[in-house]
């Protein structure tokens, strides 16, 4: 029997012992060494050969990942590890660190109970480290820390024990500050989740040279830091690897400090599921009952050239097996499971069944998308997975060959299914399709994959930035009349408080939650009681309030009112860009008593026009997306680096020394950051490393508004002059 077959059999045996299971993700900033570390763990578990670990990048299975040397998709793998005389099953997800692929990280966190955060010893905690930590903590996932590339401190920077200790203590302090800040507000975490060397929740080492240490491992092997420095300086890295192998240190830490599903699910279920806490389904999920109803959350959709579409996700209760007919949230009817498997590196191994507490890879769930709830009974779905950043950049994609058009449309729909952070707009009439993503690299990778994997040659347009529109002050009351003049709506618009907008973005307030809970949350964020109890609907980050009293026929017309409102908010009055952060109030309405005279053709335009006019009266402005920029650069290039930010309508917020480099931090509009990578390289002779992170939207400068609005209107084929405001006042 082959070694791999043996591992699969052992995994199958351990799947039924939830106490022995650990579901974990490895997450970090780009290039801090996650994938190299993952390869080491696979080698330690006997999944790939020890010699090639670190070069193999077994988890980077796509051609573009190996070419670019970064992880783009989150990859899954199951392996076994013996700890304290007991074998453990470790289901691991390696996630991307590049900011453009943060959606994969968010989804991975839903499937796991522990996150191993990897930080580069030389660079320290970076912007994306903070983002992945925040995503983990928000999903109720417990962190531990591995500080990688310690070999560089010893060999390159020639640091002695004191300097090293100071630097490493600094990294641990930064990470703990983030953990403390996030967990203080969490009622369901009653233990201290900060990491420390003494507890064994921090490990150090070098993924490249395959050695690692932690407090427990030093006690076990009798090695101390002084000896490690000696061996590393004397280039005896093989001896270091043999005496204190990285995979043992990290996997021991995983088994000791991360919760198993039995401990984790009772705490995590209330955080990610808002159904009836006393129901049988709730009990089965909290007890990880493999005999209960099946409940699985899909976190990832992938394509296998042989098996077709594969839905991977966490089984919270019940057991999934071939032939089951399962409900998929948000769709009618059921899907039949064709096959069930687990991941071993890039390969999927078919197994008979996967019980609660494990990560399964299933075919046959044709209606599932990343984020779907799959279950054997109809039930309240899981909370939607909140992605920290929204799409900010758009490209048009056309098939070079008209014959490829149907295949291109199908491929784009598939892309949107696999990666919910991508938005696709398909225009059947023009054949031009818009695809919006997190950044230039995100869209570049998607279009390359369409060409390479599907063999469809495409033309792509220049990148276009996504804008928003938002009211700046309270409007006067505006009347909206239906075309037949028999129906009137009286509406005002005002800006919504920033705290409330943020709460909606984070998913802490939605129309899916019980009304009382929603009202309390809104009042906590500063909304007054009367307004909070009259919320009719929430659309994106806009709230619609029904302040009317006893208006005849309004109840049966409300659905059309909401439809008109949503149309107005999806295409704002300035440039048909989405409106955000608006509080819309309906004060009064006059409706025709005969239903035939207050149908969709009358109500929808009346409301749409009233909302647009109220927005114009509320001084609506264009918002543009911005990015936080961090550039690390040698001293002599500091001026060039800050010049690159300032020359892009940006602002430099801070400059400071870190090690032998200067750090320049600032913000700049995404629109101006297109093409930044090649410019910064030439400005600093290739000596800079940099990072950008999407930081939401801000009001665009007044002097740039008219020109930008004209450009967008022209691009969309709209009339150049803005709609005139009807004079009601």
UniProtKB/Swiss-Prot annotation:
**Keyword Cytoplasm among record annotations:** yes
Q: Name one GO cellular component term.
A: ribonucleoprotein complex
InterPro entries documented for this protein: EFG_II (IPR041095), EFG_III/V (IPR035647), EFG_V-like (IPR000640), EFTu-like_2 (IPR004161), G_TR_CS (IPR031157), P-loop_NTPase (IPR027417), Ribosomal_Su5_D2-typ_SF (IPR020568), Ribsml_uS5_D2-typ_fold_subgr (IPR014721)
Q: Where does GTP bind?
A: 28-35, 94-98, 148-151
User: Where is it localised?
Assistant: Cytoplasm
Query: Main localisation, per the record?
Result: cytoplasm
Tell me which Pfam families the record gives. Answer: EFG_C, EFG_III, EFG_IV, GTP_EFTU, GTP_EFTU_D2
Top-level taxon in the UniProt lineage:
Archaea
Where are residues bearing Diphthamide located in the sequence?
A: 597
Family stated for the protein in its record: Belongs to the TRAFAC class translation factor GTPase superfamily. Classic translation factor GTPase family. EF-G/EF-2 subfamily.
Which PANTHER family does the entry link to?
Answer: ELONGATION FACTOR-LIKE GTPASE 1, TRANSLATION ELONGATION FACTOR-RELATED
What function does this protein fulfil? Answer: Catalyzes the GTP-dependent ribosomal translocation step during translation elongation. During this step, the ribosome changes from the pre-translocational (PRE) to the post-translocational (POST) state as the newly formed A-site-bound peptidyl-tRNA and P-site-bound deacylated tRNA move to the P and E sites, respectively. Catalyzes the coordinated movement of the two tRNA molecules, the mRNA and conformational changes in the ribosome.
Question: In its UniProt entry, what is this protein called?
Answer: Elongation factor 2
């Amino acid at each position: 029997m082959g070694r791999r077959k043996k591992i699969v059999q052992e995994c199958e045996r351990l799947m039924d012992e939830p106490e022995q299971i650990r579901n974990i993700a490895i997450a970090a900033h780009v290039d801090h060494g996650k994938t190299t570390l993952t390869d080491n763990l696979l080698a330690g578990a006997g999944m790939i050969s020890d010699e090639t670990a670190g070069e193999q990048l077994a988890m980077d299975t796509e051609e573009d990942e190996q070419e670019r040397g970064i992880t783009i998709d989150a990859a899954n793998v199951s392996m076994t590890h013996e700890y304290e005389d007991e074998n453990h099953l470790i289901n691991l997800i390696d996630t991307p660190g590049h900011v453009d692929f943060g959606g994969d990280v968010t989804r991975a966190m839903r499937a796991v109970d522990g996150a191993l955060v990897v930080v580069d010893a030389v660079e320290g905690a970076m912007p994306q480290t903070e983002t992945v930590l925040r995503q983990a903590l928000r999903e109720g996932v417990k962190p531990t820390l591995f500080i990688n590339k310690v070999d560089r401190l010893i060999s390159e920077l020639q640091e002695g024990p004191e300097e090293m200790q100071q630097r490493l203590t600094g990294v641990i302090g930064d990470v703990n500050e983030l953990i403390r800040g996030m967990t203080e507000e969490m009622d369901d975490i009653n233990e201290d989740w900060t990491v420390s060397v003494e507890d064994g929740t921090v490990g150090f080492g070098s993924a490249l040279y395959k050695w690692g240490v932690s407090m427990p491992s030093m006690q076990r092997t009798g090695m101390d830091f002084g000896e490690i420095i000696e061996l590393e300086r004397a280039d005896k890295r093989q001896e270091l690897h043999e005496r204190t192998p990285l995979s043992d240190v990290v996997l021991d830490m995983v088994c000791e400090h991360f919760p198993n599903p039995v401990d984790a699910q009772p705490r995590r279920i209330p955080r990610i599921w808002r159904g009836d806490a006393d129901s049988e389904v709730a009990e089965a999920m909290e007890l990880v009952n493999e005999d209960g109803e099946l409940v699985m959350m899909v976190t990832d959709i992938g394509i296998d050239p042989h098996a077709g579409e594969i839905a991977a996700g966490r089984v919270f209760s019940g057991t999934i097996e071939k032939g089951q007919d399962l409900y998929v949230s948000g769709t009618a009817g059921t899907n039949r499971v064709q096959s069930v498997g687990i991941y071993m590196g890039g390969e999927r191994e078919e197994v008979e069944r996967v019980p609660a507490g494990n990560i399964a890879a299933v075919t046959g769930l044709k209606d599932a998308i990343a984020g779907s709830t799959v279950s054997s009974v109809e039930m309240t779905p899981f909370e939607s997975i909140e992605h920290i950043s929204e799409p900010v950049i758009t490209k048009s994609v056309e098939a070079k060959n008209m014959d490829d058009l149907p295949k291109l449309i199908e491929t784009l729909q598939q892309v949107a299914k696999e990666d919910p952070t991508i938005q696709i707009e398909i225009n059947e009439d023009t054949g031009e399709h818009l695809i919006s993503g997190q950044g230039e690299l995100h869209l570049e990778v998607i279009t390359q994959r369409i060409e390479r994997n599907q063999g469809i040659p495409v033309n792509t347009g220049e990148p276009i930035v996504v804008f928003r529109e938002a009211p700046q002050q309270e409007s006067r009351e505006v009347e909206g009349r239906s075309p037949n003049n028999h129906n009137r709506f009286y509406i005002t618009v005002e800006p919504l408080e920033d705290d409330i907008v943020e709460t909606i973005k984070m998913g802490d307030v939605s129309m899916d939650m019980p009304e009382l809970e929603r009202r309390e949350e809104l009042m906590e964020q500063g909304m007054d009681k009367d307004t909070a109890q009259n919320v009719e609907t929430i659309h994106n980050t806009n709230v619609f309030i029904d302040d009317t009293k006893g208006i005849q026929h309004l109840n049966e017309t409300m659905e059309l009112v909401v439809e008109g409102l949503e149309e107005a908010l999806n295409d704002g009055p300035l440039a048909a860009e989405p409106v955000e952060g608006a509080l819309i109030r309906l004060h009064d309405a006059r409706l025709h008593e005969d239903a035939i005279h207050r149908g969709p053709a009358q109500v929808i335009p009346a409301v749409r026009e009233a909302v647009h006019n109220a927005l114009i009266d509320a001084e609506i402005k264009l918002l543009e997306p911005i990015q936080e920029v961090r550039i690390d650069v040698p001293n002599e290039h500091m001026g060039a680096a800050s010049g690159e930010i300032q020359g892009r309508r940006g602002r430099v917020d801070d400059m400071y020394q870190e090690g032998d480099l200067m750090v320049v931090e600032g913000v700049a509009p995404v629109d101006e950051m297109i093409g930044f990578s090649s410019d910064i390289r030439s400005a600093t002779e290739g000596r800079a490393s940099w990072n950008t992170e999407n930081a939401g939207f801000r009001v665009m400068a007044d002097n740039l508004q008219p020109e930008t609005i004209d450009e967008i209107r022209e691009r969309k084929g709209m009339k150049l002059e803005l709609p005139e405001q009807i004079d009601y006042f």
